[in-house]
A protein has these predicted regions:
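Conserved ABC ATPase "signature" region
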Residues: 3, 54-71, 180-181
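ABC ATPase NBD coupling module
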Residues: 3-20, 46, 166-171
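Conserved ABC ATPase signature
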Residues: 76-80, 84
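A short, proline-enriched helix->beta-strand linker immediately N-terminal to the Walker B motif
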Residues: 95-99
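A short, surface-exposed alpha-helical micro-motif characterized by mixed small hydrophobic
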Residues: 143-145
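ABC ATPase "signature
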Residues: 161-162
């Protein structure tokens, strides 16, 4: 491996294509002055991928993968709901065909029913494209629904690490047990089943 914190400028640019991010606030992370086509296609332009027609086609493909259609291309972020904005942010990450997507609290600003839809979308995209996710969240129900392996951090230090199944069934560290004790009784998996989205 290579230390990413030691890379700068031109040495870092090729790696940025492989590593994309989706942030917590789907409105704050989208430039309100740009159309959806410009927002999702910005990475393609920066990396010099394709001509205008090819970029538009790839943007439309990414939007369709997240459940949005062609008329969305010319619209602006304020014209969409929070869940739709997060889909736009996911399309922006997806359009470069990265190996890894950082998901920084991507569902925390959404209500539970929309969270379920976004979680199911992320699962489907992961299966389809073989994506790796680095998922940061305080919502343990969403963590349980998405994660395969988990790191538990306290005050910036890792206190426990393991598979999701092991950590949720047999937590070892007191802080992990404390966190699990705060989980709401109704699991996200139950919401997914009720919504007919699977688990």
């Amino acid at each position: 491996g290579e230390r990413l914190d030691r890379l700068h400028g031109k040495r870092l640019l090729p790696l940025r294509r492989q590593f994309q991010a989706v942030f917590q606030d789907p409105y704050g992370s989208l430039n309100p002055r740009l159309s959806v086509e410009q927002i999702v296609g910005e990475g393609l332009r920066i990396h010099g991928i394709g001509d205008a027609g090819e970029r538009r086609a790839r943007v439309l493909e990414a939007l369709r993968e997240v459940g949005l259609d062609e008329p969305c291309l010319e619209r602006y972020p304020h014209e969409f709901s929070g869940g739709q904005r997060q889909r736009i942010a996911i399309a922006r990450a997806l359009v470069l065909k990265p190996a890894l997507i950082l998901l920084d609290e991507p569902t925390s600003a959404l209500d539970r029913s929309v969270q379920c839809q976004v979680v199911e979308l992320l699962r489907r995209l992961q299966r389809r494209h073989g994506l790796s996710y680095l998922f940061i969240s305080h919502d343990l129900a969403v963590v349980r629904a998405l994660a395969h392996d988990i790191l538990v951090l306290k005050d910036g230090r890792v206190v426990e690490q393991g598979s999701a199944a092991a950590l949720f069934s047999q937590p070892r560290h007191p802080y992990t047990r404390e966190l699990l004790g705060t989980m709401p009784a109704l699991r996200l998996e139950e919401h997914l089943r009720v919504a007919g989205l699977g688990i």
